């Protein structure tokens, strides 16, 4: 059922390799029976992430689009989001009953943020393998995203990372804003991300016709 004010648009950002596309894939597969979904990915010169989602069967191919940003991918989600806004508009035209649009940014750094014109909610994904100092470094993704996902917690023993330190630093940097510790390879923590989206985004589940 379409939302009165249009679909919930969720921006998913984070450094390369942190698990953004994996999260997109899992969210699509878990939620597609309850919501009408579309997925938009951003890459600089390719459509690799969109092609991955198609190969994985995340959604039907007509519900997945890849945006080639060229140059700086951060501009395409912030200062000049016109390409992504056009992609969202195209999806809404094709699927008037859309409930949810997931928008994955290109290779981000800690300073990347989504324009409020493009995303209603933002999720920022970091991974333990990059080091347990990442939450303490701050940056808009760490401090201002609606939900911070600390992924690949299973790798902590292998890279000498302290999950306790990451939790303490995340709480200190984010204040009351929530964060989730995950191992998306095993879907651990996915339920908490979905619960956040449904509660914060005001989604109301209804069965989706096949």
Swiss-Prot record:
Please give one Gene Ontology molecular function term for this protein: GTPase activity
Q: Which domain of life is it from?
A: Bacteria
> Which gene is the coding source of this polypeptide chain?
ureG
The record's function comment reads: Facilitates the functional incorporation of the urease nickel metallocenter. This process requires GTP hydrolysis, probably effectuated by UreG.
Subunit structure and binding partners: Homodimer. UreD, UreF and UreG form a complex that acts as a GTP-hydrolysis-dependent molecular chaperone, activating the urease apoprotein by helping to assemble the nickel containing metallocenter of UreC. The UreE protein probably delivers the nickel.
Q: What is this protein called?
A: Urease accessory protein UreG
Residue positions annotated to bind GTP are 14-21
CDD domains of this UniProt entry?
UreG
PANTHER family attached to this UniProt entry: UREASE ACCESSORY PROTEIN G (PTHR31715:SF0)
Where would one find coiled-coil regions in this protein?
none
Keyword terms of this UniProt record: Chaperone, Cytoplasm, GTP-binding, Nickel insertion, Nucleotide-binding
Compartments it resides in:
Cytoplasm
* Entries under Pfam families matching the protein: cobW (PF02492)
Gene Ontology terms describing biological process = urea catabolic process
Q: Where is the secretion signal located?
A: none
What does the entry list under GO cellular component? cytoplasm
Chief localization: cytoplasm
Family the entry assigns: Belongs to the SIMIBI class G3E GTPase family. UreG subfamily.
């Amino acid at each position: 059922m379409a939302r009165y004010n249009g679909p919930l648009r969720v921006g998913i950002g984070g450094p390369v390799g942190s698990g953004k596309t994996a999260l997109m894939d899992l969210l699509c597969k878990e939620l597609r029976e309850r919501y009408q979904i579309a997925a938009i990915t951003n890459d600089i010169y390719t459509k690799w992430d969109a092609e991955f989602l198609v190969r994985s069967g995340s959604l039907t191919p007509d519900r997945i689009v890849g945006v080639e940003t060229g140059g700086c991918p951060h501009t395409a989600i912030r200062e000049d989001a016109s390409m992504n806004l056009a992609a969202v508009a195209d999806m809404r035209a094709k699927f008037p009953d859309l409930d949810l649009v997931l928008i994955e940014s290109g290779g981000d750094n800690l300073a990347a943020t989504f324009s409020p014109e493009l995303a209603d909610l933002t999720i920022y994904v970091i991974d333990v393998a990059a080091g347990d100092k990442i939450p303490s470094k701050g940056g808009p993704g760490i401090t201002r995203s609606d939900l911070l996902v600390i992924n690949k917690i299973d790798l902590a023993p292998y890279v000498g990372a302290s999950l306790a330190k990451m939790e303490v630093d995340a709480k200190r940097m984010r204040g009351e804003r929530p964060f989730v510790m995950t191992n998306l390879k095993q879907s651990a923590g996915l339920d908490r991300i979905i619960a956040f989206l449904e509660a914060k985004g005001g989604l109301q589940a209804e069965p989706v016709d096949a």
